[in-house]
């Protein structure tokens, strides 16, 4: 196996692991990293990105395996465990439905560098606004989120279908806007990542099944494992961070990255097509 390709795969796994759960959009960063490193052909990169996203998802599953098992086991009887299971299902449904109905439109019409840049910049401004004017937490326990709160966060997650918006950004800031504490909305966002990434990955994997080749399994495994461990570390670090800090730094970063997308798209330095 080519050593340079291995290094590139590790870097891509690191990028995915860092950006998947932070409110900064993993997609834009993966496109940038892949273009700068000239990483794989388009078709092979699609498959690789599916695998590193699954690595990120499984890191969440492993971290919360006890709570997930309790939630699944308690789904048939009243209690906090069933409440979490139902809330995740409620929040998952709106984005799943909209994504299923409009997936072709999103890929063919919305995925332009200018939409991506707009998603980054507008998302950054919204984070600033919520942090400064709309954050009034009334609930600090993810297990006690109401069905209405879950549905509202699910509606916010629909905005993440706009490229550059960020799934985690939409759900975290949406949760904060509707009265969840930073930690509660961040943890709930982690849980929502499981069905969203899982469903999207399985669908994308089925569509890309003809591009999968046995000789690529080594590089796919490297990306998967790297993403798993980096996501695991970032997940814990983010929860420690939000217990003491706001999301304002991420807002400024989003705006700066959005301007970078605009500049590189206008000059043609980076190919932002997918």
From Swiss-Prot:
The keyword Cell wall biogenesis/degradation applies. The chain crosses the membrane at residues 4-24, 46-66, 86-106, 109-129, 145-165, 188-208, 214-234, 250-270. Keywords: Antibiotic resistance, Cell inner membrane, Cell membrane, Cell shape, Cell wall biogenesis/degradation, Hydrolase, Membrane, Peptidoglycan synthesis, Transmembrane, Transmembrane helix. InterPro entries: UppP (IPR003824). It is a multi-pass membrane protein. One of its GO terms (cellular component) is plasma membrane. Its main location: membrane. GO terms for molecular function: undecaprenyl-diphosphatase activity. GO terms for biological process: cell wall organization; peptidoglycan biosynthetic process; regulation of cell shape; response to antibiotic. The keyword Cell inner membrane applies. Its EC number is 3.6.1.27. It catalyses: di-trans,octa-cis-undecaprenyl diphosphate + H2O = di-trans,octa-cis-undecaprenyl phosphate + phosphate + H(+). It is found in: Cell inner membrane. HAMAP family: Undec_diphosphatase. Catalyzes the dephosphorylation of undecaprenyl diphosphate (UPP). Confers resistance to bacitracin. Belongs to the UppP family. PANTHER family: UNDECAPRENYL-DIPHOSPHATASE (PTHR30622:SF3). This is Undecaprenyl-diphosphatase. The lineage of its organism: Bacteria, Pseudomonadati, Pseudomonadota, Gammaproteobacteria, Cellvibrionales.
């Amino acid at each position: 196996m080519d050593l340079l390709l291995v290094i590139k795969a590790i870097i891509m796994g690191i990028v995915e692991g860092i950006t998947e759960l932070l409110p900064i959009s993993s997609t834009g960063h993966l496109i940038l990293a892949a273009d700068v490193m000239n990483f794989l052909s388009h078709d092979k990169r699609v498959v690789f990105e599916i695998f590193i996203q699954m690595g990120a998802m499984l890191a969440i599953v492993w971290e919360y395996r006890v709570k997930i098992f309790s939630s699944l086991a308690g789904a048939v009887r009243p209690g906090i465990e069933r409440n979490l299971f139902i809330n995740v299902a409620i929040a998952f449904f709106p984005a799943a439905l909209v994504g299923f109905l409009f997936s072709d439109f999103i890929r063919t019409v919305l995925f332009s560098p200018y939409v991506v840049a707009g998603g980054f910049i507008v998302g950054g401004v919204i984070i600033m606004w919520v942090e400064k004017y709309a954050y009034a937490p009334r609930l600090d326990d993810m297990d006690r989120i109401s069905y209405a709160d879950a549905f509202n966060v699910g509606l916010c997650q629909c905005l993440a279908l706009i490229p550059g918006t960020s799934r985690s950004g939409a759900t975290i800031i949406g949760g904060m806007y509707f009265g969840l504490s930073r930690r509660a909305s961040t943890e709930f966002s982690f849980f929502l990542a499981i069905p969203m990434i899982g469903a999207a990955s399985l669908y994308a994997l089925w569509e890309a099944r003809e591009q999968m080749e046995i000789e690529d399994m080594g590089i796919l495994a490297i990306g998967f494992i790297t993403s798993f461990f980096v996501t695991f570390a970032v997940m814990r670090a983010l929860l420690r961070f939000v217990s003491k800090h706001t999301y304002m730094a991420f807002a400024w970063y989003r705006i700066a990255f959005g301007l970078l997308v605009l500049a590189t798209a206008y000059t043609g330095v980076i190919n932002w097509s997918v």
